[in-house]
Amino acid sequence: MKLLTKVAAHCGVAFAALVAAVPASASLLPQSWNGYHWAHTGNLAIMLGNNVSATWTPYVTAAAAAWSTDKYIDYIPTAGSTTGSTCAAMYGTVQICSSNYGATNWLGWTTVWTSGTSIYQATIKLNDYYFNNAKYNNAAFRQQVACQEMGNALGLQDADRIYTNLNIGSCMDYSNDPSGTKGTNGTLSNVGISATDFSHLDDIYAVLDTTQLIYTKPGAFTNPQSVAGGVPEPSSWAMIVGGFGALGMAMRRRKPVTAVAFAG
């Protein structure tokens, strides 16, 4: 059986234009992805550039609206600044893309560019190579993956990585059945954000930083084309497809920094 798992590839960073204070407890938070977060002196309004197909748009829109109910963060939907196939990053924004990226072994791939632990741009790729297949071409998998990758882009790690246990009612939870209707993972749906997810996200963002990108300040920008380009120094989470028997697994690896964002 093909299962989903996730690979974290952490690359060293050299870009030092943005230096921000990291919450003192970040390294202790179970749902913090290496302490990565968007630096903020107040609330965040993060532009979400739409580079996805019409098929993906309702799922991306729903996930953005759901994450935007958090008390610290709003995703601001904007026109995309790239193409689905290229999915180039734009400084100060998250660009979300869909395309047929081929047999890469991943369904969704989130890349963040950081200075220290402060995120200054991110991309999300949704791989139609797999979503055009019957197993994944359904509303539950599409919504769960879009929701989870957008959570990762905020610095939130996954809630659970075991595919065969009961769903916990969170898009950050791995499952063979995110719909909760097939009798394999209980009856809870894993397509939305749980109260626990919001609690963990709020723990990450409860402590203010000393700086904030002007592009992420509420009301500052609504056009990603006005944002300057950044230097690629990516760190990535990938939701991959692989055969690991009856158990999902998580792996961590390191790769050298390259001149372009990598896709595994």
Give the ranges of each region predicted by the language model:
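Short, threonine-centered small-residue motifs that mark membrane-proximal processing/anchoring sites
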Residues: C11, F15-A26, N223-V241
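Zinc-dependent metalloendopeptidases
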Residues: S25-G229
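Generic hydrophobic alpha-helical membrane-span motif
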Residues: L154-G155, M239, M249
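C-terminal membrane-anchoring or membrane-association module
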Residues: G248-G264
